[in-house]
A protein has these predicted regions:
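A conserved mid-protein helix/loop that constitutes part of the nucleotide-sugar donor-binding site
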Residues: 41, 45, 265-288, 305-311, ...
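Membrane-proximal helix-turn-helix segments that form the acceptor-binding/catalytic region
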Residues: 160-192
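Carbohydrate-associated surface elements
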Residues: 198, 221
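Nucleotide-activated donor-binding/catalytic signature segment of Leloir-type glycosyltransferases, i.e.
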Residues: 311-329
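Short alpha-helical donor nucleotide-sugar binding micro-motif in glycosyltransferases
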Residues: 328-329, 336-341
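Aromatic "clamp/platform" in nucleotide-sugar-dependent glycosyltransferases that forms part
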Residues: 349
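Short hydrophobic beta-strand element within catalytic cores of glycosyltransferases
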Residues: 366-369
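Conserved acidic donor-binding segment of nucleotide-sugar-dependent glycosyltransferases
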Residues: 381, 385-392, 401-407
Length: 442
C-alpha cells in the first residue's frame, strides 16, 4: 500500500518564526464545502484532522452563495473568481495569492499547501511565496493532460460527446495551456505530493520535473465513520435499508436480511454524469448481467448533462426497467446507498486516484473497477473484481463473477473494510502530511 511513514523526530522544529510546537498551515484550494467535490471533501477532512492534532489551519477558497461548515481550529477565507471553465483556476489563483500575502502579514504562515490543478500560479508567484511567506507543498490531484487523455480514451469507446459538457470541452481544448501552471507548481514548490503512483508517473511522463524533484505519494483516505457497513440490528437503519431496497425493486427476502445470496442484487455506480466516468460502458454491460441475474438492479448516482442520454440508451438496450438514475442526494443518503448495495461498479476512464472505490470498501461493499492504475493501487481480487477498461463484455463478466460467489463476496466485504482502516483514512493522511511539513521545515 502507498503512504508515508511519519519520521520519529520531535514535533518541535525550527521555522521562520522561531521554535514552535504547532504550525499555521495555509491551504489554498479551489474547492471547499459547500463544494463537496473530491478535492473539497478531502481538504475539509484533512484540515479538520490537522487542527485536531494541534495545528492552526486557514483555508483560502472560492466564494459561494451557501454557508461554509465550521470546524474547530479551521478558518476559511473566501476570494472572488471568474465563473468560466478553466479560467477560474487562474482568476481564483490570483486572488488567493493576494489573500495569502495579507494573511501572512496578520498571522505568519509556516507552510503553504496548494491543491493542484484547481489553483493556477505562475513561476514568479511560487518563487515569491517561497521567499517571502513559507515553503510550499503542492498536492498533485491528477493532471489536466491526464484528464484530457482520459476523455480521448472515453471517446474511442463511444462514450458521450465531450462537447456536451462545457467543463469537459474546456479541458479538451485548453488543458495543454493550463498545464503550464502545473509545471510551475512542480518546479516552484519545495515538495510535491502525488495522490497515487499513477499520478506521479503522469507528471514524470508528460511534464518536466526538476532533477532534484521531491515528490511523495500519499493516497487520500475516506471518512470511515460516515462510510461504514450496514448494521441490520439497528431498527431505524434497517427500516431505511428496507425502504431503499424496495424503492428500486431489489428486495427479495434474502436481500432484506443482508444475505449475499440474494437473487435481486443491487448494483451502484457513483460519479458525475460525464463521458470519462464510463456510464455508457456500464449500460452496455447490463444486458449480459441481467441475462445471468434477471433480478439485478442498477442505480447510478451523479449530477451532469448525461442523464437523459443514459436513459435513452437504457431504453434502446431494453434494460430501462432495471436502471435508476439519481441526480444527487445528501451524504447520509449516499452513505446508505453504499451500505445497501451488493456491488459498487466504477468503470472510469481516468482518475487521479478515485475515492468512490474506497468509500465502497469502507461501507463493506465489494468493488468492480478497471484493471489499470490508479484503481489497481487500491482494488484487487481480494476486495472485488477487475475488468479491461472500455470492454463492456469483460465488465459484465466481472460483475457476474462477483454476484455468482456470495460466500467470497462476503469475505471481500470484510477484507475491504479492513483495508481502508489499515491504510486509507483521514487520520493516516493527517499524519503523513504532518510528517512532510516537518521534513520541509526541519
Amino acid at each position: 500500500m502507498q503512504g508515508l511513514v511519519k519520521p520519529s523526530f520531535s514535533m518541535t522544529f525550527k521555522c521562520r518564526s522561531g521554535f514552535v510546537t504547532t504550525m499555521h498551515i495555509a491551504m489554498v484550494s479551489g474547492e471547499y464545502p459547500p463544494r463537496w467535490g473530491g478535492i473539497g471533501s478531502v481538504v475539509y477532512h484533512l484540515a479538520g484532522h490537522l487542527a485536531s492534532r494541534g495545528h492552526d489551519v486557514t483555508v483560502i477558497t472560492r466564494t459561494h452563495k451557501q454557508a461554509t461548515p465550521q470546524q474547530p481550529g479551521v478558518s476559511v477565507l473566501h476570494v472572488p473568481w471568474v465563473k468560466a471553465p478553466m479560467m477560474f483556476t487562474r482568476s481564483y489563483g490570483k486572488h488567493a495569492f493576494v489573500e495569502l500575502r495579507r494573511l501572512h502579514q496578520v498571522k505568519p504562515v509556516d507552510v503553504v499547501h496548494t491543491l493542484l490543478p484547481l489553483v493556477s500560479w505562475t513561476r514568479k508567484e511560487y518563487r515569491w511565496v517561497e521567499e517571502h511567506v513559507a515553503p510550499v507543498v503542492s498536492a498533485l490531484n491528477g493532471s489536466w493532460i491526464g484528464e484530457r487523455e482520459g476523455m480521448k480514451r472515453a471517446a474511442r469507446h463511444k462514450e458521450a460527446a465531450t462537447w456536451k459538457n462545457p467543463n469537459d470541452l474546456a479541458i479538451l481544448l485548453t488543458g495543454g495551456y493550463y498545464a503550464r501552471y502545473e509545471q510551475a507548481g512542480i518546479e516552484g514548490s519545495t515538495a510535491c505530493v502525488a495522490i497515487s503512483a499513477s499520478t506521479k508517473a503522469e507528471f514524470e511522463h508528460w511534464y518536466r520535473p526538476p532533477e532534484d524533484w521531491w515528490c511523495e505519494t500519499v493516497l487520500y483516505g475516506v471518512d470511515h465513520k460516515v462510510f461504514r457497513p450496514m448494521n441490520h440490528d439497528h431498527e431505524e437503519e434497517q427500516l431505511a435499508y428496507e425502504e431503499l431496497r424496495k424503492s428500486y425493486g431489489a428486495a427479495d427476502e434474502a436481500a432484506l436480511t443482508g444475505d449475499a445470496s440474494t437473487e435481486t442484487p443491487l448494483l451502484l455506480a457513483v460519479g458525475r454524469l460525464v463521458a470519462r466516468k464510463g456510464h455508457r460502458t456500464l449500460l452496455r454491460a447490463m444486458p449480459s448481467v441481467l441475462k445471468q441475474h434477471p433480478g439485478a438492479r442498477l442505480v447510478i448516482v451523479g449530477r451532469g448533462h448525461m442523464g437523459r442520454t443514459l436513459m435513452r440508451q437504457a431504453k434502446r438496450l431494453g434494460i430501462a426497467h432495471a436502471v435508476h438514475i439519481q441526480p444527487g442526494m445528501s451524504f447520509d443518503q449516499l452513505a446508505l446507498h453504499f451500505r445497501a448495495a451488493d456491488v459498487v461498479v466504477y468503470p472510469s476512464y481516468y482518475e487521479g486516484q478515485g475515492l468512490i472505490p474506497l468509500e465502497a470498501l469502507a461501507s463493506g461493499t465489494p468493488v468492480v473497477t478497471v484493471n489499470q492504475p490508479p484503481l489497481t493501487e487500491m482494488i484487487d481480487e481480494d476486495v472485488g473484481e477487475l475488468f479491461t477498461c472500455g470492454d463492456h463484455e469483460d465488465l459484465a463478466r466481472a460483475v457476474n463473477r462477483c454476484l455468482d460467489q456470495p460466500e467470497e463476496r462476503t469475505q471481500q466485504m470484510v477484507r475491504g473494510r479492513q483495508r481502508v482502516l489499515d491504510h486509507y483514512t483521514y487520520e493516516h493522511n493527517a499524519e503523513a502530511y504532518e510528517a512532510i511539513y516537518e521534513s520541509m521545515l526541519s
